[in-house]
């Protein structure tokens, strides 16, 4: 029942997450509709504004554009427009309208009328409705007299419109409105405007009936028939001056709106490029002047829409009184509504809306005065160009003049991109939080007992959640790259590991489609490069993922070759080649465009995705200073389809690093059987580069014939891919190989399915594809035949040699020895430049002469010796007389002597065991007393299951000795009789299922592999010295105290074994019990808080969850946690402020550095700026949601020393308490 409830909880959480994503896409795709809705007409209130129609009660507005109610701010704008006119007469006459009415009223009306008309001039326009747009006043010569500030949102030459340039040069000529009209429409617009002036002269104001006028003689608005304008009349105002702007009706049947094409658009880099404009004649009636309302009909760019939308909907808006009406969209920057849809606001003095104020630097992450560095994908073309501290976001500079359209366009683009990034980043944070809850719940759910159907449902939920997370991350990365806010790291990394980890990550996806994955890195690849491995991995994953989507049969291969090598830099050429459908030539231009997918005509589009992978890859490669392109074979008819993505990037190298090691197998003859020619080519390239003689075969029957026809000495190792072969043929080959060639030729079986390799139970070594270089080398070493000329036969020969070796005689003189008839073979040794020196194998080119007779028993297996040494050959040998060869012989002799010492120690241990049996009774009594004392004092419990005791070790050594020196052994060692020189296998080769074979482990992802590598570095292997002076009752760990490690018990589990402990925190200590580590969790999201608590408690930690930072700080001293997981986004006091408060308290209390709390940031943000902010606040580490439990364990493992320090303090306090109790007793 509980399982079903939890499953229902998961499904409901995923449902709400999917709904959020759908709403997010609906919001992005319908932003144009959102802007249009924001510009809807604001209807007049019938109580305040009464509309009268002579014919009917319907408000017919067919001849008008979208109109808006004039508020006080718009009244001020019109008054300012007219008063700021350069025409002195116009300005005077307008003032006469405001004050001259009083004079007329004094002569014709009583004092009551004076009180009604002696009002603020804004009342003239109170009930008046105008067209939304930018206002212009022109005279009869069509010259611009005055303009509103909102004209700046349309035209780039605002200085010419306002007459600024004319005043500078001393000219008195006004700027003609016709200059703003495109050449083909100038005559039509000019005729239209002049006709309007002519019609204004024939207007008669006495045409309205007295019945329409209200008794109060105030301003009223009247709507009359179609094709007639809106008018406002004042019965008491009879001023007939022609220079006065009056309100009246135009009796002309001509429309008052005209559409045409204009020039000098703000968003056009080409000033002569036309754009659509609409001009409406406002009902200001004058003989000499006309007021025009202009509206830009050109489609606004997407970035402008995103900016407007984010300004209206962002929770971080500058003002809570923001308006979404069209009146604020054309704001000139002088109003108090700072949160409007206008790209300018009053808080920035007319500059575009920005998350920073005017005094901050440029929106570029490098500041405004810095040069364009490698972090910009656009190069120097988008560099900041301003010497002042103002943002380069407005077409006006600090002097009020207009910059060039191209410069202003780039500046606006930068600001709008940054604003849209803030919006998407906020949405990304809100989406990643529920996704984290889904993924964490899945991990907890999988730890319970589930049915097959439930596991299937969980897999679907897990896949959907990860796809959702990938989509959100891609959208955010795309916007950050395009805005230039993404920076690259420059760290040391291993290129080979990065590429092989990528292949391992996409291997399950390829295996689901029965595709092959392979990678080839050039042989002389340096071990170390400097660059950003995370972004390089992202590019490779995108390209490989694209190849897997469009490939149904075949393979996807990666290759890396050097293109240009400099002293401190190397240009590497990456190729990702697939065998898919290919890309047509006409679709190449659309390939790297964002939010697009290419469809090759008749090919069915089965691959789905956001269309951002290739666009992000292109930007990242350009950000690294490289280039990317694609070549395709889709148009060829030779059967070779598919495409290849190329990109070249420079990577810095370390000139002080050692030369790259090169494996040398001394002409080892290898038969490669693989039906896939591409995978076979990759294998052959590696083998030939490692000095192997390669024989190719594409059919297993052909391989069997070659084994029969060729001499046995000419084929030493067979590599066979069992994925693409017939099962019957493989069974026949297996039977023939076991009957004829077993023990003489090594066999490596390869498969993409690990379970298939294990079920076969056939072969000397097993290799899982996609293979790694280190795994391939290990399999070759393990599969070499016992007496191959390519192996280090010197090891086996040393055992049977006489005293010539002990006397350090020259090996070349062995040709005169009757027992050793050998010749020196001066070829490349399989061992070179290792810690064990160079070794030269001795053999004859025609006859392989072995030193051991049929009755000799080899005490050392060559293959096991090569594995135990842990060194792979690198450079060529210097010959049999080289000091390294002699040193190698001495090392082997020391190994033999050490083994003899082990045998003597075994005999001594047997004697000690007999003595121990006589003392058992005394020891039992002592143990009973000790157990009673331990129970009383709550001392340490014995946990012998997690440690190897001496008796068990001696038994294993007895078994090894028995296998090594049994009289019933034959010349050729069987699988169960192979002697081992090292008691513990190397972790890098994984778990060995058969003593005569090596089983290569392919990890699921790179994180597990990196964790294992960290464990290998910190692990001390079992050595013979650790067995000295240990008896059967010793409870101390034989690994030299590694049991004190917090995560020591998980090493065995990481490499494929089982661990007795179920959690990291429950790892036993050899000296004291493990104290549960206290962890405090701060998160305002109850779902995330509960899941985090469940994950940590399941691993044995003691958790203290808090949903409020104030409560957590108040109980901090009482709880005294070792680790604090801090959510950055919390109400009241956020995570940054809480961390600063904790650090301040620690400083005031003079807390030592080792005693400070470990604070780990827990947030859904993935921006580098947030990480820097976390570290600046005093946090120790950073983990981004959603995360997997393995990632959490890795974070905790990094702070193992601090946790151990707290554990030591706990142990000391426990010992002190026990001492006090004992003294009291």
UniProtKB/Swiss-Prot annotation:
Q: Where in the cell is it found?
A: Membrane
Transmembrane domains' residue ranges: 8-28
**What positions are modified (4-aspartylphosphate)?**
721, 1127
> Which residues are in the Response regulatory domain?
669-784, 1078-1200
Q: Where is this region: Disordered?
A: 313-407, 809-832, 941-974, 1021-1076
Q: Name one GO cellular component term.
A: membrane
Q: Name one GO molecular function term.
A: ATP binding
Report the record's Gene Ontology biological process terms. positive regulation of chemotaxis to cAMP by DIF-2; response to ammonium ion; signal transduction involved in cellular response to ammonium ion; sorocarp development; spore germination
- Biased amino acid composition, Low complexity: 313-356, 370-388, 1023-1037
Q: Matching InterPro entries, A to Z?
A: CheY-like_superfamily (IPR011006), HATPase_C_sf (IPR036890), His_kinase_dom (IPR005467), HisK_dim/P_dom (IPR003661), HisK_dim/P_sf (IPR036097), Sig_transdc_His_kin-like_C (IPR004358), Sig_transdc_resp-reg_receiver (IPR001789)
Question: Residue ranges of the Histidine kinase domain?
Answer: 426-653
Tell me which EC number(s) this protein carries: 2.7.13.3
Enzyme class, broadest EC rank: transferase
Say yes or no: keyword Phosphoprotein present.
yes
Per UniProt, the keywords (alphabetical) are: ATP-binding, Kinase, Membrane, Nucleotide-binding, Phosphoprotein, Receptor, Repeat, Transducer, Transferase, Transmembrane, Transmembrane helix, Two-component regulatory system
Q: How does the record say this protein sits in the membrane?
A: Single-pass membrane protein
ATP-binding as a keyword of this entry, yes or no, is yes
Q: Where is the composition biased (Polar residues)?
A: 357-368, 389-407, 945-954, 1058-1072
Q: Which residues form the signal peptide?
A: none
Residues that bear Phosphohistidine: 429
As its record notes, the protein acts as a catalyst of: ATP + protein L-histidine = ADP + protein N-phospho-L-histidine
Query: What's its job?
Result: Acts in a signal transduction pathway that regulates the slug versus culmination choice. Believed to be the first component of a phosphorelay that couples the sensing of ammonia to the modulation of PKA activity and hence activates culmination and spore germination. Ammonium transporters amtA and amtC are thought to respectively activate and inhibit dhkC phosphorelay. This protein probably undergoes an ATP-dependent autophosphorylation at conserved His residue in the kinase core, and a phosphoryl group is then transferred to a conserved aspartate residue in the receiver domain.
Q: What is this protein called?
A: Hybrid signal transduction histidine kinase C
Give the organism the record lists.
Answer: Dictyostelium discoideum
Its organism's taxonomic lineage begins at: Eukaryota, Amoebozoa, Evosea, Eumycetozoa, Dictyostelia
């Amino acid at each position: 029942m509980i399982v079903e409830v939890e499953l229902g909880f998961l499904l409901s959480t995923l449902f709400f997450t999917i709904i959020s994503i759908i709403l997010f896409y609906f919001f992005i795709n319908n932003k144009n509709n959102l802007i249009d809705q924001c510009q809807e007409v604001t209807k007049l209130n019938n109580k305040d504004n009464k509309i009268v129609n002579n014919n009917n009660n319907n408000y017919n507005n067919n001849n008008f554009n979208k109109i808006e109610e004039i508020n006080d701010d718009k009244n001020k704008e019109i008054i300012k427009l007219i008063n700021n006119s350069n025409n002195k007469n116009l300005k005077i006459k307008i003032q006469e309208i405001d004050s001259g009415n009083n004079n007329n009223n004094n002569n014709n009306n009583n004092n009551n009328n004076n009180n009604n008309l002696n009002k603020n001039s804004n009342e003239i326009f109170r009930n008046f409705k105008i067209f939304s747009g930018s206002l212009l006043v022109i005279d009869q010569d069509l010259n611009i007299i005055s303009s509103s500030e909102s004209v700046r949102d349309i035209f780039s030459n605002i200085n010419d419109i306002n007459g600024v340039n004319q005043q500078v040069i001393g000219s008195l000529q006004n700027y003609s409105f016709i200059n703003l009209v495109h050449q083909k429409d100038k005559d039509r617009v000019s005729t239209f405007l002049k006709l309007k002036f002519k019609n204004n002269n024939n207007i008669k104001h006495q045409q309205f009936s007295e019945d329409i006028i209200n008794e109060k003689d105030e301003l009223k608005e009247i709507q009359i028939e179609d094709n007639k304008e809106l008018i406002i009349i004042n019965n008491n105002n009879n001023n007939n001056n022609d220079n006065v702007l009056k309100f009246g009706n135009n009796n002309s049947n001509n429309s008052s709106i005209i559409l045409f094409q204009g020039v000098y658009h703000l968003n056009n880099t080409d000033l002569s490029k036309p754009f659509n404009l609409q001009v409406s004649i406002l009902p200001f009636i004058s003989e000499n002047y006309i007021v025009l309302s202009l509206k830009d009909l050109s489609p606004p760019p997407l970035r402008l829409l995103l900016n407007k939308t984010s300004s209206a909907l962002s929770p971080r808006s500058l003002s809570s009184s923001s308006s979404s009406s069209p009146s604020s969209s054309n704001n000139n920057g002088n109003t108090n509504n700072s949160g409007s849809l206008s790209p300018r606001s009053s808080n920035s003095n007319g500059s575009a809306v920005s998350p920073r104020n005017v005094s901050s630097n440029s929106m570029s992450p490098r500041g405004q005065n810095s040069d364009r560095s490698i972090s910009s994908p656009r190069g120097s073309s988008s560099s900041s160009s301003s010497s002042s501290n103002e943002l380069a976001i407005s077409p006006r500079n600090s002097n009020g003049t207009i910059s060039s359209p191209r410069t202003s366009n780039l500046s606006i683009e930068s600001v709008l991109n940054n604003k849209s990034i803030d919006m998407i980043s906020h949405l990304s944070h809100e989406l990643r939080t529920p996704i984290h809850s889904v993924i964490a719940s899945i991990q907890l759910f999988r730890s319970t007992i589930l049915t097959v159907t439930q596991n299937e449902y969980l897999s679907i939920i897990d896949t959907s959640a990860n796809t959702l997370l990938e989509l959100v991350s891609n959208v955010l990365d795309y916007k950050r790259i395009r805005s230039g806010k993404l920076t690259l790291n420059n760290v040391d990394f291993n290129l080979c590991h990065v590429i092989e980890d990528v292949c391992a990550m996409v291997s399950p996806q390829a295996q689901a489609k029965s595709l092959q994955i392979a990678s080839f890195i050039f042989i002389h690849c340096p071990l170390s490069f400097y660059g950003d491995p995370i972004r390089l991995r992202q590019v490779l994953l995108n390209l490989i993922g694209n190849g897997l989507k469009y490939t149904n049969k075949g393979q996807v291969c990666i290759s890396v070759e050097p293109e240009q090598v400099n002293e401190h830099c190397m240009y590497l050429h990456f190729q990702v080649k697939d065998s898919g459908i290919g890309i047509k030539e006409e679709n190449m231009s659309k390939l790297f465009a964002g939010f697009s997918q290419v469809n090759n005509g008749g090919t069915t589009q089965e691959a789905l995705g956001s269309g951002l992978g290739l666009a992000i890859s292109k930007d990242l490669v350009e950000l690294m200073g490289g280039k990317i392109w694609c070549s395709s074979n889709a148009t060829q008819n030779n059967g070779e389809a598919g495409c290849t993505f190329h990109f070249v990037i420079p990577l810095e190298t370390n000139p002080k690093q050692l030369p790259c090691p090169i494996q040398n197998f001394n002409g080892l003859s290898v038969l490669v059987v693989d039906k896939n020619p591409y995978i076979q080519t990759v294998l052959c390239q590696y083998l030939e580069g490692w000095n192997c003689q390669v024989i190719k075969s594409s059919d297993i029957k052909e391989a069997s014939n070659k084994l029969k026809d060729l001499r046995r000495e000419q084929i030493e190792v067979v590599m066979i891919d069992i994925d693409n072969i017939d099962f019957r043929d493989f069974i026949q080959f297996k039977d023939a190989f076991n009957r004829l060639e077993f023990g003489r030729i090594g066999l490596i079986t390869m498969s993409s399915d690990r379970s298939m390799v294990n079920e076969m139970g056939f072969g000397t070594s097993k290799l899982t594809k996609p293979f790694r270089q280190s795994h391939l080398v290990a399999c070759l070493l393990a599969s070499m035949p016992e007496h191959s000329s390519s192996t280090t036969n010197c090891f086996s020969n040393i055992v049977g040699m006489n005293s010539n070796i002990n006397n350090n005689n020259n090996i070349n003189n062995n040709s005169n020895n009757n027992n050793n008839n050998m010749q020196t073979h001066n070829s490349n040794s399989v061992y070179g430049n290792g810690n064990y020196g160079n070794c030269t194998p001795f053999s004859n080119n025609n006859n392989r002469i072995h030193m051991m007779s049929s009755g000799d028993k080899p005490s050392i297996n060559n293959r096991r010796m090569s594995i135990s040494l842990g060194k792979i050959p690198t450079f060529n040998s210097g010959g049999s007389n080289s000091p390294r060869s002699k040193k190698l012989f001495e090392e082997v002799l020391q190994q033999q002597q050490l083994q003899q010492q082990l045998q003597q120690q075994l005999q001594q241990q047997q004697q000690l065991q007999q003595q121990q049996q006589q003392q058992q009774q005394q020891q039992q009594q002592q143990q009973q007393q000790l157990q009673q004392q331990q129970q009383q004092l709550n001392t340490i419990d014995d946990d012998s299951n997690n440690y190897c005791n001496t008796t068990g070790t001696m038994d294993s050594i007895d078994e090894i000795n028995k296998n090594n020196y049994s009289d019933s052994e034959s010349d050729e060692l069987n699988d169960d009789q192979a002697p081992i020189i090292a008691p513990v296998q190397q972790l890098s080769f994984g778990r060995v299922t058969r003593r005569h074979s090596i089983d290569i482990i392919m990890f699921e992802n790179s994180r597990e592999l990196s964790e294992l590598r960290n464990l290998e570095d910190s692990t001390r292997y079992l050595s013979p010295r650790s067995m000295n002076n240990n008896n059967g009752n010793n409870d101390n760990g034989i690994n030299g105290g590694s049991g004190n490690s917090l995560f020591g018990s998980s090493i065995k589990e990481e490499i494929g074994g089982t661990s007795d402990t179920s959690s990291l925190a429950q790892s036993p200590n050899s000296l004291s019990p493990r104290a549960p580590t206290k962890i405090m969790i701060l998160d305002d999201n109850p779902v995330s808080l509960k899941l985090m608590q469940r994950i940590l408690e399941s691993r044995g930690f003691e958790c203290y969850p808090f949903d409020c930072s104030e409560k957590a700080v108040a109980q901090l001293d009482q709880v005294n946690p070792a680790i604090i997981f801090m959510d950055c986004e919390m109400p009241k006091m956020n995570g940054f402020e809480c961390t600063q408060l904790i650090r301040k308290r620690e400083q005031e209390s003079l807390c030592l550095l080792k005693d400070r709390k470990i604070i780990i940031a827990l947030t859904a943000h993935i921006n580098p700026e947030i990480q820097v902010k976390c570290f600046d606040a005093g946090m120790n580490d950073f983990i981004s949601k959603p995360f997997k439990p393995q990632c959490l364990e890795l974070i905790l493992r990094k702070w193992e020393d601090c946790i151990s320090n707290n554990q030591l303090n706990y142990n000391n306090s426990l010992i002190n308490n026990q001492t006090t109790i004992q003294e009291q007793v």
